[in-house]
């Protein structure tokens, strides 16, 4: 069984049981964003989380070890075609240099970690149209001189 097999099984079960990512996350004690990423194969589960996920979804036993495998974090380098993903790509394209300038002005020369990192998605109801709130929280890592 490979990561893609587990991902496809999870999507099939999620659809069959009419589950949300939030319900799956609650069942295993993680956040919806993190568990979704793990189910898509971009993060590895601890043994405890993998066991809970396999049990909750009724996945085959061999899925546990696959969920615990360290992923190769790679993705298609082509410009995304999905409209939602493309808009995030567009945000980074338009505001990336701005964010870099502001972050480095506040923190110095370095980067925001995507390893020591968390992310949250919230919904804000608004009479002019509901708003998506993305919160990214990454540790600042200064570049070292030697």
From Swiss-Prot:
GO terms for biological process: cyanate metabolic process. GO terms for molecular function: cyanate hydratase activity; DNA binding. Gene3D superfamilies: Cyanate lyase, C-terminal domain (3.30.1160.10), lambda repressor-like DNA-binding domains (1.10.260.40). It comes from the Bacteria. SUPFAM superfamilies: Cyanase C-terminal domain, lambda repressor-like DNA-binding domains. The active site is at 87, 90, 113. Pfam families: Cyanate_lyase (PF02560), CYNS_N (PF21291). Keywords: Lyase. Its EC number is 4.2.1.104. InterPro entries: Cyanase, Cyanate_lyase_C, Cyanate_lyase_C_sf, CYNS_N, Lambda_DNA-bd_dom_sf. Catalyzes the reaction of cyanate with bicarbonate to produce ammonia and carbon dioxide. PANTHER family: CYANATE HYDRATASE. Belongs to the cyanase family. HAMAP family: Cyanate_hydrat. This is Cyanate hydratase. It comes from Marinomonas sp. (strain MWYL1). The gene is cynS.
């Amino acid at each position: 069984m490979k990561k893609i097999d587990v991902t496809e099984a999870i999507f099939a079960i999620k659809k069959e049981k009419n589950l949300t990512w939030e319900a799956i996350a609650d069942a295993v004690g993680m956040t919806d964003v993190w568990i979704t990423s793990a189910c898509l194969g971009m993060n590895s589960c601890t043994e405890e989380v993998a066991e809970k996920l396999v049990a909750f979804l009724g996945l085959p036993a061999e899925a546990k070890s696959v969920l615990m495998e360290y992923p190769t974090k790679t993705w298609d380098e082509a410009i995304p075609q999905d409209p939602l993903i493309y808009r995030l790509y567009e945000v980074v394209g338009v505001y990336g240099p701005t964010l870099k300038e502001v972050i480095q002005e506040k923190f110095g020369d370095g980067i925001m970690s995507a390893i020591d990192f968390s992310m949250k998605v919230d919904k804000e109801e608004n009479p002019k149209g509901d708003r998506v709130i993305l919160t990214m929280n990454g540790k600042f890592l200064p570049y070292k001189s030697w």
